[in-house]
Amino acid sequence: MTVLGTALRPAATKVMLLGSGELGKEVAIECQRLGIETIAVDRYPDAPAMQVAHRAHVINMLHGESLRALIEQEKPDYIVPEIEAIATDTLVELEQAGQKVVPTARAAKLTMNREGIRRLAAEELQLPTSSYRFADSEEGFRAAVTDIGLPCIVKPVMSSSGKGQSFIRSADQLSEAWRYAQQGGRAGAGRVIVEGVVNFDFEITLLTVSAVDGVHFCAPVGHRQEDGDYRESWQPQQMSDLALERAQAIARKVVLALGGHGLFGVELFVCGDEVIFSEVSPRPHDTGMVTLISQDLSEFALHVRAFLGLPVGAIRQYGPAASAVILPQLTSQNVSFGQLQSAVGAGLQLRLFGKPEIDGTRRLGVTLAVADSVEEAVARAKTAAAAVIVEG
């Protein structure tokens, strides 16, 4: 039975967020709703979740001893990773000593890099995936491309938001693709995955919750990617009953194999009735921000409810909804937002993340819309996002 203490009191229930971006901010808010003491950690100060947490710490989370020292200092009841770039071996050791890691330290370790989760999915669980090879050197990379064939995709085994990722159409792109992959890894230069191109009709994120009362599925989320990062997402994505059944079967296998309780973002390719596994995040997914307006329980509320050991019950989806990102390009440490009257209204909401600075292109907010159709919801969200004026 779950018992929650009161924040800032001796019996407080403490949650430590490792990673304090916009997704962590929403998780922190859901924890605050339940009176949970929230500690936000990231590699830079004033990150979004730090602005709504009880305490904040700035450390290099890839440095195992620094991470261990902070955890031993704060003594959280739950450690909740929000990003991949964490010293996961340290989390495994701490979990073995009794520390609770959400959903499990093994899940964090396997999904920290694309190799761990790809080998689990393709080789252990025998799920359908794209063809793939791994490489440690430029010579090995070129050999992998020859094996896979063109066109293909190369990604650092550890990166996010499209960093270091290239779509290779011809052999004269290989040197630049290798160089970019070595620059884009979250933990520095190193191993890459070369993937064959999958012919698909659309991509989905199947938000899957593993909780004390079983495995639950949100309605499938469709999304559009550009430069490796999402631009719009919508719910529900229309798909055949057979494809949805297959998608749920794949997602169930993956989350049960990873173990623990929480919400998982399972990314899948859909072609007709066929479904191919792509990736999984053992935490809320950026494309799932649409659930802030589309469901009675957002992906963040579901994640917190699940890892606290509370039942999820039924998830109510309200109908066609969409999100669109606010993605300006500028350099500033004093960003302001204008023309906001065009970004809010009936069935139209706005979230600004509070990121302290921007240097280039950065996702600073999202608009959320509901409508009578998915197409109309996407159009409303995109129009609202485009109307916001970002200055600094």
Curated annotation (Swiss-Prot):
Positions with a binding annotation for ATP: R114, K155, S160, S161, G162, K163, G164, Q165, E195, G196, V197, V198, E203
Chain positions recorded as Mg(2+) binding sites: E267, E279
Pathway: Purine metabolism; IMP biosynthesis via de novo pathway; N(2)-formyl-N(1)-(5-phospho-D-ribosyl)glycinamide from N(1)-(5-phospho-D-ribosyl)glycinamide (formate route): step 1/1
Alphabetically ordered keywords of this record: ATP-binding, Ligase, Magnesium, Metal-binding, Nucleotide-binding, Purine biosynthesis
Signal peptide as annotated in the record: none
Record Gene3D superfamilies: 3.40.50.20, ATP-grasp fold, A domain (3.30.1490.20), ATP-grasp fold, B domain (3.30.470.20)
GO molecular function: ATP binding; magnesium ion binding; phosphoribosylglycinamide formyltransferase 2 activity; phosphoribosylglycinamide formyltransferase activity
Binding partners and assembly: Homodimer.
PANTHER family cross-referenced by the UniProt entry: FORMATE-DEPENDENT PHOSPHORIBOSYLGLYCINAMIDE FORMYLTRANSFERASE
Name used for this protein in its record: Formate-dependent phosphoribosylglycinamide formyltransferase
Species per Swiss-Prot/TrEMBL record: Klebsiella pneumoniae (strain 342)
Lineage: Bacteria, Pseudomonadati, Pseudomonadota, Gammaproteobacteria, Enterobacterales
Gene of this entry: purT
